[in-house]
Regions:
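Short beta-strand elements
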Residues: 55-66
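C-terminal binding/interaction regions
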Residues: 1-41, 46, 64, 95-150
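Short, solvent-exposed loop/turn elements at beta->coil junctions and helix N-caps
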Residues: 45-49, 74
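A short catalytic or substrate-binding loop motif that flags glycine-/basic-rich loops and adjacent residues
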Residues: 40, 50-54
């Protein structure tokens, strides 16, 4: 390996070490291997929320028999927004709709384990997008424009 390749490898390892320190192992793994990323073509509800930082997170929900059957997210934001969107989607899958209403930024943060103080707002943003998608679904259902059962 030449000096340049060694420099690049060393730099990459330092970046990974810093990310592990900042996000913990679960957050680091999700940063490197995002899950539930992408749009659900057959989503029953979707919401896009933009935070004060300028990042946006979209949450997509597939709902059947009163439960979140599938969820996904898309973000135009930073790596922390991606981590938080991924965990918010994961937390929703398999839960009944009432249980999903309890998912907030603290729930997302607890699932990740830790985030830098300056990035914690991303957990709130992901939870807000999830709650907005659920709210839109419930509003359509209550108005008779959605499925016969939530």
């Amino acid at each position: 390996m030449d000096k340049f390749d060694q420099f690049v490898n060393d730099l990459q390892e330092r970046i990974f070490d810093e990310a592990r320190e900042a996000y913990g192992e679960k957050g680091f793994d999700r940063w490197r291997n995002p899950r539930f990323n992408g749009r659900l073509a057959s989503a029953d509800s979707m919401a896009r929320v933009t935070g004060d930082c300028g990042d946006s997170i979209e949450i997509y929900l597939k709902i059947a028999n009163g439960r979140i059957e599938d969820a996904a997210y898309v973000t135009d934001g930073c790596g922390t927004s991606s981590i938080c969107g991924s965990f918010a989607a994961e937390l929703a899958i398999g839960r009944d709709l009432e249980a999903v209403t309890d998912i907030d930024g603290e729930t997302v943060l607890n699932a990740i384990g830790r985030l830098p103080e300056e990035d914690r707002h991303c957990a709130d943003l992901a939870a807000a997008a999830l709650q907005e998608a659920l709210s839109r679904y419930m509003q359509r259902w209550a108005s008779g424009k959605g499925p016969s059962e939530p």
